[in-house]
Amino acid sequence: MKSVLLISNQHPNENGIGNPIMYRMEQALLRNKRVSKVKFVPFFNNLKSLWQIRHTAHDYDIIHIHFGGLYALIIRIILIGIAKPMFITFHGTDIHAKSLQSAKSRLLRWKIILNQKASFMSIRLFDRCGFVSENMLDYIPQNIKKKYYHKFFIQSLGVDYNTFTISSKEKAQDDLHFPRGKYILFSDVSNSSIKRRDLAEAIVAHLGTHYKLLVMCGVKPCDVPTYINASDLVLLTSDEEGSPNIIREALALNKPFFSVKVGDAAKQLEGLENSTIISRNPIEAANTIKEYMSKEYVDFTRTKLQDVLDFNIINERIIDLYEQI
């Protein structure tokens, strides 16, 4: 049995709002019989946090950092001398740096470039390097890819089926104290212009007055399943994404999903009857959504795609890697 230390700079803030992926990953690993103990240590930008990580690392068999960038490189350097297998999983912009396209200041652009360069350097230093989608490999310099390809693995993100359980749309709307109606969920947790809320609003406007846009922003992670259950469909209009987990979360709750072509959205929706890629033209997108929503729901993706959605199943493949090294 392996003990695993998870580290990331992505975590909910003091109000419980933010990226919950690491806590959900921790809980899913804790349920696995091949894992003796798991601890997630969030990284904060201070020396105390670095000291805590190094001190804690001695007590675990595997150290696995999620999300690359300068912070991950610094942690790897801080952990020099600790003879434990070191894993890192990159999640998107830490490799492809597509957010450069929308960066509004020179300082932010330099930060994005620095984090990308630090990620490339980290590939040399870690024992195994994971990527949440295969298309991220296209952004790695050829000399690095060729030399270190043997370290690479794909770690698809997943959904905690114990947390994401289906309830009726009406009950979910009542739980959120929303008026009964037809809602299109739009996830914009960080209130970022990259998510293109303006495009989502334009699409919904062309769908007619019977649909309302439900914006999920500043929501605690425990409320996310309720928001999805309360909706009729989920919409993604971002300019940039890596491997958006909101797609998996919606499919795990049997919700139709409509996304512009971004990240690996097309791959996630491939072969589905009730979900599809839509145009960035609001009128064309609205027409596609109308067409698909008029169909009978037949996908039942929670069951059909459980092998690629359920954290409990996905983690088995990661634990295989832990045991091989």
Protein language model features and the residues they cover:
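A charged, aromatic-enriched C-terminal amphipathic alpha-helix characteristic of glycosyltransferases
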Residues: 20, 280, 293-324
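A short, active-site helix/loop in glycosyltransferases that binds the activated sugar's phosphate group
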Residues: 120-150, 159, 163
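Conserved donor-binding/catalytic core segment of Leloir-type glycosyltransferases
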Residues: 159, 178-195, 201-204, 208
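A short helix/loop element that forms part of the nucleotide-sugar donor recognition site in Leloir-type
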Residues: 165-178
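Aromatic "clamp/platform" in nucleotide-sugar-dependent glycosyltransferases that forms part
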Residues: 239
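Short hydrophobic beta-strand element within catalytic cores of glycosyltransferases
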Residues: 256-259
